[in-house]
Amino acid sequence: MARHKRKRRRDVNPILLVIVLVLLLANVVVFLRREGRSLPGEGVRLPDYVTADYLVKNEWSRPGTPLTKINGVVIHDVGNPGTSAQANRNYFNGLALSHETSASAHFVVGLKGEVIACVPLTEVAYASNERNADTVSIEVCHPDETGEYSAVTYERVVELTAWLCGTFDLDVQEDVIRHYDVTGKICPKYYVEHPEAWEQLKADVEAKMAP
């Protein structure tokens, strides 16, 4: 008479089972956080010295494209000496009707240190070519053709850049760049032609961030 061998039941190690369940749960939590996470600029309160005067939504200067990453700050100059922050903001806004070009910036810093926010930090601005998708842009007014900022404008640029770096955990030396560093355009003019002044500006930003 043939004997049927009884199959030996393998006991599941309860500790191993717990570890597997914990790992699965952790992966689910990470997935849900990624799916539900907000944009990096969402809920960020602007400094008191910034006036929010956002452009109308339009395909030429404020397309409304979500800014899903903030990996840097790009500094520009406006290129039209003696003009105010408000004038440059209005120019960007007018592109909705003129269709002259695609251009804008998140911020414009004026000749008297005033700052206008033109595009929310949750949206892409048309300023820095391929880096539009992951940077915040600052256009800076200047009094003359040299492109050098006035003292009050310079201090505000330093202050605003330091705030952005602190808010979005950016490295000043690596993540604060010129328009020139993206496209080779001579912008901001003075700080391309005087690289030592550019290095000093970044050093001043770092000093502003120091506790």
What residues fall within each predicted segment?
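Basic/polar, cationic surfaces and motifs that engage anionic cell-wall
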Residues: 2, 8, 12-18, 31-51, ...
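N-terminal catalytic cores of peptidoglycan-degrading enzymes
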Residues: 2-128
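Soluble periplasmic/extracytoplasmic beta-strand elements of cell-envelope proteins
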Residues: 74, 108, 137-139, 177
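Short, low-complexity, polar/charged sequence segments that are solvent-exposed and flexible
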Residues: 92-98, 126-128, 135-138, 155-159, ...
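Short acidic/His/Gly/Ser-rich catalytic and metal-binding motifs that mark active-site loops
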Residues: 127-129, 185-186
